[in-house]
Amino acid sequence: PNGSGKTTLFNSIVGTHPIDQGSIIFDNTEVSEMPVPAVAKLGLLRTFQQTKIYTKLNCVENMLISHKASDSGFIFAKIPTDLTEKAENLLNFVGLYQKRNLRAGDLSFGQQKLLELAMALMNEPEMLLLDEPTAGINPTLINGIIDRLIKINKDYGITLLVIEHNMKVIMSLAQKIFCLAHGKMLAEG
């Protein structure tokens, strides 16, 4: 249900929300005290219910600026060809190749969600936390998102942790389900 603490849990896992007690271990590393960029460099990334994209940049630029190497002056640097090719391949994977030069702000909300997913994949995460990846999406696009998420898990070996209210999506994706309410786990299976 809404307000059960799911997004807060994700925020705590990636370091944007402090935890009150306990610890968060990822790949044998305590991450609860680490800054967000350090957690991301370990391979733990997330997407958001409300997308975090750069609306004035085109899709390829969004992909490049999201890459972990971009902190070295992306705007003024010569972009390696292989990085641009990787960005375009991922845009193709999510179905946005034809829109790669379009400003991200001109994409539909569903396309912006796909762009954000591709941006996360640019950094080859080990685990990807997805906060309601199909919320507000056209029903015909939902099946495409499900198919891509299954492929990300099976073909790329990326573990997915998904917050989702759509039971069709949950049943299509989940190998294990946890149900939270008011910050407590009610059930798992």
Kindly give the residue locations of the regions a language model identified.
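Conserved ABC ATPase "signature" region
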Residues: L64, K78-K99, T140, D147-I150
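Conserved ABC transporter NBD signature motif
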Residues: G22-T29, L42
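Catalytic Walker B motif of ABC-type/P-loop ATPase nucleotide-binding domains
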Residues: L128-E132
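Helix-to-loop junction immediately C-terminal to a conserved catalytic motif
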Residues: V14
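H-loop/switch region of ABC-family ATPase nucleotide-binding domains
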Residues: E164-H165
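Conserved catalytic motifs of ABC-family nucleotide-binding domains
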Residues: E124
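Conserved ABC nucleotide-binding domain
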Residues: S32-E33, L90-S108
